[in-house]
Amino acid sequence: MASATEDPVLERYFKGHKAAITSLDLSPNGKQLATASWDTFLMLWNFKPHARAYRYVGHKDVVTSVQFSPHGNLLASASRDRTVRLWIPDKRGKFSEFKAHTAPVRSVDFSADGQFLATASEDKSIKVWSMYRQRFLYSLYRHTHWVRCAKFSPDGRLIVSCSEDKTIKIWDTTNKQCVNNFSDSVGFANFVDFNPSGTCIASAGSDQTVKVWDVRVNKLLQHYQVHSGGVNCISFHPSDNYLVTASSDGTLKILDLLEGRLIYTLQGHTGPVFTVSFSKGGELFASGGADTQVLLWRTNFDELHCKGLNKRNLKRLHFDSPPHLLDIYPRTPHPHEEKVETVETTETSGRTLPDKGEEACGYFLNPSLMSPECSPTTTKKKTEDMSDLPSESQRSIPLAVTDALEHIMEQLNVLTQTVSILEQRLTLTEDKLKDCLENQQKLFSAVQQKS
């Protein structure tokens, strides 16, 4: 159990939006924070003292989702105006816009390598876009209601999505097929995501629950009922050991996934909390909600997570359902004193590219937004001295083989650990059997002596 000195604390307070915060993301370098709001604006906050915050103007309706690209030089946003925008996260805030769906777009998510972007919409579809080719690739259709969220797995092989049809679906990005389906008869998931190792998914439920599923064996591992309102968002700590949740009951809760219990309840917002996210290093996390404020928290408790790495690996191999958390009482809530951060804002806007439709052959990126993640020129320069293969499919073969080998090695590692655990259990069983036989022999001898 963490001591009081390791409690998370409120570090900074940001206020600049005029309506509820819907989504936020911390930059990969940990120096910036992007927020989206019902006020139709994006804001980019800099963590340097007395630094300006930049307000990005362009969307015509609620901004529903925002995310930094893996290298931090692009910012993607989704809106109820049915568009997705790609911004350069600087003072000028140049952007490109494309009409992504025929209904409001609910989420955007970059693949870990930055080559693809997934969008989820109320038109019941998930769409995948190539940042390399700068165009639409394919749609995923199987949901029968609004799709609220879609996320890539860390290796990019899978996409997980959740919908108001009360299902969570796992998609194979290679064959574009739904390979698994989790159903719920009570409520639907507002948010879903993979853990950093890609072995599990967690869902934030409208029925006040948080569920963790193992995608390798398609089994529910953990089921938390610790909120008194719908759960709107979750975020995994990079160590895989912790999960932070945001709820309409106005609280944030931190779950210890190794021990399967609630360890912190954080109170700082004065209304429903809609979004929360850990930084890439896990030392910070940010939250936003209906009170229009953004809170930046210092994690603290993650300093000891390295000690539990071996325990974590063993935990992943144990598929028995853990105790249900209905009877687990949380710690005393930790109200934190607000530290108001006054931030000067600068209005910025960008140039809109003409809409060419999702099937158009034209590029959807403004050339000025080209980055190492999506630039064909950059990629060509990196590879021209390594191969002269003429076709794109031929160039992708070595990468596919490498990914397959890495996946095989991961599975072999899991099997090795599984065998080790089985050997330990077998040894314990043999010891217990030996004790039983010895006790039986003693009882038999005692009976013979009495007779």
Curated annotation (Swiss-Prot):
GO biological process: cell population proliferation; centriole replication; cilium assembly; positive regulation of centriole elongation; retina homeostasis
Coiled-coil boundaries: 404-443
Keyword field: Cell projection, Cilium biogenesis/degradation, Coiled coil, Cytoplasm, Cytoskeleton, Phosphoprotein, Repeat, WD repeat
Residue positions, PTM Phosphoserine: 321
Superkingdom: Eukaryota
Post-translational modification: Phosphorylated in mitotic cells that may be mediated by CDK1.
Chain positions of WD repeats: 16-55, 58-99, 101-139, 142-181, 183-223, 226-265, 268-307
CDD domains: WD40
Region (Disordered): 372-394
Compartments reported by the entry: Cytoplasm, Cytoskeleton, Microtubule organizing center, Centrosome, Centriole; Cytoplasm, Cytoskeleton, Cilium basal body; Cytoplasm, Cytoskeleton, Spindle pole
Pfam assignment, any one: WD40
Gene Ontology CC terms: centriole; ciliary basal body; cytoplasm; spindle pole
InterPro entries xrefs: G-protein_beta_WD-40_rep, WD40/YVTN_repeat-like_dom_sf, WD40_repeat_CS, WD40_repeat_dom_sf, WD40_rpt, WDR55_POC1
Main location: cytoplasm
Family as reported in the entry's similarity comment: Belongs to the WD repeat POC1 family.
Protein purpose: Plays an important role in centriole assembly and/or stability and ciliogenesis. Involved in early steps of centriole duplication, as well as in the later steps of centriole length control. Acts in concert with POC1A to ensure centriole integrity and proper mitotic spindle formation. Required for primary cilia formation, ciliary length and also cell proliferation. Required for retinal integrity. Acts as a positive regulator of centriole elongation.
Oligomer and partners: Interacts with POC1A. Interacts with FAM161A. Interacts with CEP44; the interaction is direct and recruits POC1B to centriolar microtubules. Forms a microtubule-associated complex with POC5, CETN2 and FAM161A. Interacts with CCDC15.
Protein name listed in UniProt: POC1 centriolar protein homolog B
Species per Swiss-Prot/TrEMBL record: Pongo abelii (Sumatran orangutan)
